From Swiss-Prot:
It comes from the Eukaryota. The modification Cysteine amide is found at residue 8. The keyword Transcription does not apply. Exists in two forms, due to cis-trans isomerization at 2-Cys-hydroxyPro-3. The cis conformation is the major form. This is Contryphan-Le. The lineage of its organism: Eukaryota, Metazoa, Spiralia, Lophotrochozoa, Mollusca. Transmembrane segments: none annotated. Belongs to the O2 superfamily. Contryphan family. The keyword Isomerase does not apply. Disulfide bonds join 2-8. Expressed by the venom duct. It comes from Conus leopardus. GO terms for cellular component: extracellular region.
Length: 8
């Protein structure tokens, strides 16, 4: 997951 987009 991305730090700024939890759904990545």
């Amino acid at each position: 997951g991305c730090p700024w987009e939890p759904w990545c």
